[in-house]
A protein has these predicted regions:
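Basic, glycine/lysine-rich polyanion-binding surfaces/domains
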Residues: 1-169
Length: 169
């Protein structure tokens, strides 16, 4: 939004000559509401599609078109027809865990408008400071170049047990 808050998270996917926005159903109205005022200037329309979204986790270098990566893995998305059957799959919980391990936070509807991109790692690969412009860019850029990181989304992998915390904490 104009204050630099993240309203929704999504992935832009280009297949052939069409662009698709991969977004949770809860965010569709928020997303279109924020962008409809700009869409009319470019003769752009938003249509809801009912494709299957297939996510892939590949070793680094094995994917042509990935949306996020680290030193070892790449995450990739594809759109398929509804009757597509995937034979080599993981469940949604495993996919979400892979995203969290890579430091990707997927927002819930209740998170809309609570965070700026730098607070949830969107400055790493989701917000470009080199090109384009977006609503709230001045605030976000000022935080990036002049501010101090006060909050950051971090992923910790721990064993499933409780630690004994000393009383002085």
């Amino acid at each position: 939004d104009h204050k630099g808050q993240v309203m929704a998270d999504f992935v832009v996917l280009k297949e052939d000559n069409e662009f698709f926005i991969i977004i949770q159903k809860d965010f569709i109205s928020i997303f279109t509401g924020e962008l409809e005022i700009f869409a009319k200037f470019g003769s752009v329309s938003f249509d809801v599609c009912d494709h299957k979204i297939i996510g892939e986790i590949n070793k680094k270098g094995d994917s042509d078109n990935f949306y996020y990566s680290n030193d070892e893995f790449e995450l990739n998305l594809h759109l398929k027809k509804l009757n597509y059957k995937n034979k080599n799959s993981i469940n949604l919980d495993m996919w979400n865990a892979a995203n969290k391990i890579l430091g990707i936070l997927h927002l819930n509807k209740s998170d809309s408008g609570k965070f700026r991109p730098l607070e949830i790692n969107f400055d790493k690969q989701r917000v470009s400071f080199e090109k384009g412009c977006f609503r709230g860019q001045e605030i976000v850029a000022r935080m990036k170049y002049l501010g101090i990181d006060r909050r950051k989304f971090c992923t910790f992998i721990v064993q499933n047990f409780l630690l004994s915390i000393p009383k002085y904490f």
